Amino acid sequence: MSERIRVRYAPSPTGYLHIGNARTALFNYLFAKHYDGDFVVRIEDTDSKRNLEDGESSQFDNLKWLGLDWDESIDKDKGYGPYRQSERGDIYNPLIQQLLDEDKAYKCYMTEEELEKEREDQIARGEMPRYGGQHAHLTEEERQQFEAEGRRPSIRFRVPQDQTYTFNDMVKGEISFDSNNIGDWVIVKKDGIPTYNFAVAIDDYYMGISDVIRGDDHVSNTPKQLMIYEAFGWEAPRFGHMSLIVNEERKKLSKRDGQILQFIEQYRDLGYLPEALFNFITLLGWSPEGEEEIFSKEEFIKIFDEKRLSKSPAMFDRQKLAWVNNQYMKTKDTDTVFELALPHLIKANLIPESPSEDDKEWGRKLVALYQKEMSYAGEIVPLSEMFFHEMPELGEEEQEVINGEQVPELMTHLYGKLEALEPFEAADIKKTIKEVQKETGIKGKQLFMPIRVAVTGQMHGPELPNTIEVLGKDKVLSRLKKFV
């Protein structure tokens, strides 16, 4: 593209970084970086009553964790600030006055009760609810009368009639709206704060935003924003609206959906890797060419093509996320995965709160056993249950294995050799099992399966010698003794 690409992610600090918002930020970031453009983070904080104390800092912290490095924001002013909407009143106020002076906006003194009554009557008549324009042409005398009654006005934009607003959406194609279906809408609330659709259009223009990429739920906001651009004689940015994210039942992803964790913070807490979430979220509504699904951030930037954004809803597949994270887990060194797993082991009282070096070394060996199968670091706790609790009651299949004819002989030989073994390490344990094989003539499944069942209570699991080392000599001998 010949012009400089500038995109923005504009969260509200009324909440934490949600999967849907993370996807919006991520697609904007990839689009900007692909075209060597600017990724701007702007804070839409005018809803002061709902703002969370740590909402803003949480947004930035989680964006940074995901690897989304912004070019401009509250900490990097490149001349387009302020980057908080609440600090941009000096920009909005003259423009509001200009619209009033040009009769493109007017003061409306209707009360909430009057507006609600109008809405109810329209619905009862089967009409689409919209403001009827009762205060669109007040006389000065009428305005003064309302002021004297103590009514505080909102300011409404005067919607042009019989006009079609059309834009070419980069995802959905051409979309049109009839202005006659849109009532005169509020641009400034009674408390003097500009509304979203007014402020966002002003901000995008003054910040030189070239492309607005956002969720499907913003399509209906676009004609109102186009009206603002038209009223000031400005060129509008290009728009792209991403498809919905749906759950596995194909229903819109809702914050009330208890089946799916909704916030990036929750995945961090469970021990997911940022690269894996970056990868997984990028594939929610966008697809690369070919079959490959695992890419680095740099590879995604290189191959990102907005033409491959999907019109169809993107399904949040939990199994797919587990698979993607597991692919990244396998590539990490054990120390990295152990550091992610350590808080979970401590929380479950499986490792002391202030672990010694010996505790940590044991923990690393435990993590190494399961690293290739872990979906996330916190999964180490349920996976390694056998190391910390009494053996579960054996199932029918396990009973059949442990009741084999050669098992007593096998266990007697193994017990004696392991009891004398020092140091109790995987390499020596492996040799010991081979010695037992030679001495007894028992081999293959008849050798390994009874040993595994005897010490773990399970038919399958990680490398047997390593498992025995991590279980520890005392626990292994105690469990073997039952079958000698």
From Swiss-Prot:
One of its GO terms (cellular component) is cytosol. The keyword Nucleotide-binding applies. It holds the Pfam family Anticodon_2. Its main location: cytoplasm. Gene3D superfamilies: 1.10.10.350, HUPs. Its EC number is 6.1.1.17. ATP binds at residue 255. Keywords: Aminoacyl-tRNA synthetase, ATP-binding, Cytoplasm, Ligase, Nucleotide-binding, Protein biosynthesis. A motif ('KMSKS' region) lies at residues 252-256. Monomer. Belongs to the class-I aminoacyl-tRNA synthetase family. Glutamate--tRNA ligase type 1 subfamily. Catalyzes the attachment of glutamate to tRNA(Glu) in a two-step reaction: glutamate is first activated by ATP to form Glu-AMP and then transferred to the acceptor end of tRNA(Glu). HAMAP family: Glu_tRNA_synth_type1 (MF_00022). This is Glutamate--tRNA ligase. It comes from Staphylococcus haemolyticus (strain JCSC1435). The gene is gltX.
